[in-house]
Amino acid sequence: MLMITSFANPRVVQAFVDYMATQGVILTIQQHNQSDVWLADESQAERVRAELARFLENPADPRYLAASWQAGHTGSGLHYRRYPFFAALRERAGPVTWVVMIACVVVFIAMQILGDQEVMLWLAWPFDPTLKFEFWRYFTHALMHFSLMHILFNLLWWWYLGGAVEKRLGSGKLIVITLISALLSGYVQQKFSGPWFGGLSGVVYALMGYVWLRGERDPQSGIYLQRGLIIFALIWIVAGWFDLFGMSMANGAHIAGLAVGLAMAFVDSLNARKRK
């Protein structure tokens, strides 16, 4: 699959896709922040891009409208929903994204009811040698959050970045990034502060690093992160390291997570180039 272009206007993208269908080229539309056009048969990429250039010069050409009539797509392509916020949540998040979000919320509620310490006894990084074979602990520390702001901040980024990775690269890729970054960021953080920590931020930083570098080195992957946001992430790490806001931050997890994401993106982008 090759992403050809993105359109902000669904009417325009549908007209182009319908026209190409009349020319024997099948394109698909994926709705994210914009309407992304994907081509399954990459051997036709040059032809599609040439036609796209002609289309952009005059999208109102009668032949494009005629193609839409022929395909039966004369509507706006817009679907108005009563609850656009929840529709946006659903469209961007795949099953793994949802499972992790729900797990974090359930654990957060349990911590409010039972207390932080009680839940940490079951989910925290192994704090005693006898617990080292309770393998879930190397990952479940990422599900624990200690304030409403903590969980909201992490889940917003998880939904935004994790959802993009899952939608574009598949659930398997998101699972691999999540497990590796949770394990390694947790290992580094326990070296910094001991086993009593929690939060999804190590995984979030891994996703930030991955999405940014993969988008820079492999634009055809269809994922990207604005450079301003990765700069924000670096500033936040520096602020946490020097305790500029007086907040307790898992600095080791943040740095390790970012490094893991960058490393995985570098390897994946190299592999993508070799396949071309």
From Swiss-Prot:
Chain segments annotated as transmembrane: 94-114, 142-162, 169-189, 192-212, 229-249, 250-270
Listed InterPro entries: GlpG_N_sf (IPR038236), Peptidase_S54_GlpG_N (IPR022732), Peptidase_S54_rhomboid_dom (IPR022764), Rhomboid-like_sf (IPR035952), Rhomboid_protease_GlpG (IPR023662)
Name of the protein in question: Rhomboid protease GlpG
Membrane topology: Multi-pass membrane protein
Keywords, sorted A to Z: Cell inner membrane, Cell membrane, Hydrolase, Membrane, Protease, Serine protease, Transmembrane, Transmembrane helix
GO biological process: proteolysis
GO molecular function: serine-type endopeptidase activity
Pfam families the record matches: Rhomboid, Rhomboid_N
Cellular component annotations (GO), alphabetically ordered: plasma membrane
UniProt catalytic activity: Cleaves type-1 transmembrane domains using a catalytic dyad composed of serine and histidine that are contributed by different transmembrane domains
Top enzyme class: hydrolase
Cellular location(s): Cell inner membrane
Active-site residues (renumbered): S201 (nucleophile), H254
The organism of origin for this protein: Shigella boydii serotype 18 (strain CDC 3083-94 / BS512)
EC numbers: 3.4.21.105
Function: Rhomboid-type serine protease that catalyzes intramembrane proteolysis.
Family: Belongs to the peptidase S54 family.
